[in-house]
Every structure is written in structure tokens, then in C-alpha cells.
């Protein structure tokens, strides 16, 4: 782990997933995600939309894809490609509608490049992401048991 302040640890129902946050790509998104993690926002949140060969989406407090923290983010599109293990912000049609929902790519998804804000990548536990139950919506979904910043984990 290179930078504990920018390393997020997700304990999921399928196992641990470690995400390296990239503040140089999306400083506003990284700051928001860190604040939500430290507030316990993601604890118990389900993976509500999981499409085989594409991505696993989480971060909706309702478990439906319709909710968020209530604080929209300005887009920080960047040149980082959407490849296996990329962590990117979900949004509605408006580019500046990202909030708390994010997704992890199972595979390359270049059609998302420059249209969604990449803010991190999975560095450990991608095999656990691969085990997340698929569905849209997911029946009896897997969840984030707890989310912590490595700097705060004892």
C-alpha cells in the first residue's frame, strides 16, 4: 500500500477489495468519497446493479440506484481508460450528476472513456469483485459490509 490516506478498503460479503484512489485524476471525487467513507455512508450498502462482463455498481442508500448523498459533483472527466479494475463514478444523463454511486469494471469498457469520472483502481481483491452476484436489479444482493480508509484502519 503506497498511500494509506488514498487507499480505501472495502470489506464486502465476498471478501476484501482494496482501491487505490487517484486524487491527481479527480480531486473532488476522491475528497467526496473519502468523506462519505469516514461518515460510514457505504457501510451496509448493496451492489444494486451488476452486469456480467461490464461492471458492479454500488453506493445507493436505497439499494435501487435512485439515491445518493444529496450532494452532486461536478464532472472531472480524465484520460484514464475504463479497463478491468477501474473504479469510476456513476451518474445520470447530466455530466454533473455524480453523487455517491460508483462502479468497478469487470472488463474493458472503452465506450465510457471521457464520459465518466475515473477516480481509482482495484489493487487487491479483484477476484472478490468477480464473485459479486449479477443482476439488474440483483436479487438478494452482495454488499459492502464496511468501508474504511487505510489511514484510519487500526
Protein language model regions, located:
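Cyclophilin-like peptidyl-prolyl cis-trans isomerases
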Residues: 1-154
